[in-house]
Amino acid sequence: MRGTPLMPRRALGPAGLVAAVVVLIWVISGVGAGDIAKFVGYEIAFVLLPGASLLWALRGREGWLVTVALGWPLGQTLEILVFSATAATGSRGLFPVYPIVVVLACALRIWKRHGHDPSGSSEGQMSAGAMWVAAAALSLGLVYVCLAFLPTVPLPSLARPIQYYVDFPNFIGLIAEVRNHWPPTSPGLSGVPLHYQWFVFYQMAAINQVTGVSIPVIAFRLDFLPTILMIGCQLFVVGRFIGRSAWVGALAIVVAFLLGPLDLTTDAAGAPPFFDLFSFHLWASWTFPFGLTFFLALLYLIAERVQATTWRTSADIRTWVVIGLLMIGASGSKATILPVLLVGTGLYAVVVFVTKRTVPANALVVLGLGIVIFGATFAIVYGGGVPGTVIQPIASYQYTAPVKVASKISSGLLRKAVLPFAYIVGLAGMLLPFAGMLYLLRGPHRGQLSRYTLCLCMFGGGLLIANLIHQVGSSELYFQDTGYTAGFIVAAAGLRLAWMDVRSIGASATKAGVLAFVGWVVVILAVSAVTSPALAQGGLVLRYVAITFIYLAFVTVVVRYSRTAGLPSPGVLMVGLIPLVAAAALTTPIQLSPVIGRFLTGQPMTVTQPDPQKVRGLTPGLLVALQWLQDHTSADTVFAVSNHWIDAAGTDGRNQNYSAFSERQIFVESYNPDDYGITVGIPTLAEVNFLYRVRLNDAVFDHADTGALTILTRQYGVRFLFIDRVHGGANPAVFQLGSIVFSNNAATIVAVG
């Protein structure tokens, strides 16, 4: 394809660095070369090539970075829609043909347009320095994510017991459910529909179907890295487009992956003092980063659209098709994406109307298209409801350290006076990574704020939604973190301007700024070194107060000294930004220091060795039993389990290891109704059915009730009883209810159907 903007030679080095880091992580984490080759081949053939081909067919030839940033999520949408269609029609065998059909059809369209001017954007020249900074920041960000994620997800082992983060077995079970059944239902509540953000699990199931790579290897090792990589690439592209500088894109990667709200406690497993951590959600929620790949692509296209003067030419319509497809992908990937886009675009339209007295037509089209697609997917994918959602403003701030401490003040009058300030401090702590935004308020730079209006509206939209509602498990924070992604670009723009201003003052100012940054790093590390994870919240807050006073003194002294000494004044915003960025940059290193320490000293990075008397995990014996079910039963098999708890006290009923590692459906597995989208206390047929199943299951395993067993086998198709002998066992009479087909020291399987 003549005229195609290929990757410039100067970009090969930065791209090679990131690729080398990804491959090295895969190899170190135990992924075989064959699995890596199959996975990479799949991603290129089934995602990148179809998406890039359709993008070029609709919009003309784009630059290589834009092609990847937009073509990848577009390819994911195509992949998911075709996979769903072939599964729904019982023709899964046709799925491998889809890339050939799409690429050939699009190639024909592109060939027919040969010689026409491309409608896509030109990337022009990019600073080599910006590309290297972006590559280095993204590489370090990948390492951070892996150090947080990989120790929690050892591959299933026949050598040692494992305890997974509570959501991960559920995710594995959902992938297996998609792979084996259509339409997919809840693997832990057999046959019951589960309205959920399924698309990332569709994708992993599709990879398993085509490549044969095991589901745990795909989910725990392979699939998350390209997603994080794509977010970094998209931040660079969107930041460069909106900020009109590659440095804005590079610094957006720095803000997103390397900055966070300061945590002094070196306790990655504990609750952070400012509660919300974007970096945590990148690995703990598989749907969140997957959804962000659609959000950032849409942000780019919407930013492009609102700058356009037309909305209904043939080129416009082709772009609307791309936006519509991405909105479909976004809505099924993460429920927070379209609401934030819609609210943010609505705020943008209001701002433009108020400031310019004009109605932005393209913004209205975005709103109309988004509302239609959101309404359709809300009904189809999510069943028209969001269980556990209530109107409760600023609910998540109550979990920040300042609010916790203020809430414990014994004097009611003093508590009421202090609490509003505690909430403000809690919000400020959450937003520390966005300190760079403040620099745009400096007089000479205020004029640039209008360039970032859309990003600021998306950022504000996420905050607005998150602070109006409350969801189970504080899931409203995903709205906030989705908005954060647009805010990263604005913060990066402020940091770029600050650095340019420092350099404009002179070499001595640049040197002083670097030394001040290093000095603050040393101060904060020193405070962290003497701060125990067991420190009470009050003591922790006092340390933050002490750092704040040192900060205020530092800013005051530097600004006054500059004025009295007749030096060029750096200004309060420039001086004040240095400690804030230093503090934000230390968040992840401090949190990961225990893991890094184990790695450097040669100790095992994975410390999840559960004691069955305290924590219930996946033991080698249980894994063997679950694999027996996977190998000796059909994919449609339903079985019942004796244990539902992840703790020996029987207070947390979210054990979902059985469906995950047998890849079979279970009569009722988790005793936590939230896992099935059921809110106990609100009378519904779903709640009645769930509680009825719990009673039947307990009757079988606790009392060997033959009547209950008859209902299980005849009405619900249960064919096996799985007795977990490590975690509680069952009534001895249960072993007489059928024929024992498998038994070891960890589990017994009784055939009853």
Predicted ranges, named:
Residues T319-A335:
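Membrane-interface alpha helices of multi-pass inner-membrane proteins
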Residues G124-Q125, Q307-I317, T355-L364, A435-M458, ...:
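Membrane-interface helix-loop-helix junctions at transmembrane boundaries of multi-pass membrane enzymes
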Residues S127-G129, G141-F294, R598, P604-G617, ...:
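Active-site lumenal/periplasmic loops and adjacent helix-entry segments of GT-C-fold
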Residues M1-M126, A534-T548:
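Membrane-embedded, hydrophobic transmembrane alpha-helices
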Residues A45, P533-G753:
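Extracytoplasmic
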Residues L298-Q307, T345, A349, Y423-R451, ...:
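Hydrophobic, aromatic-rich transmembrane alpha-helices
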Residues E43, L225-I228, P339-L341, G473-L497, ...:
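Hydrophobic/aromatic-rich transmembrane helices and adjacent perimembrane loops
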Residues S29-G34, V354-R446, T453, G460, ...:
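Transmembrane catalytic cores of multi-pass membrane glycosyltransferases
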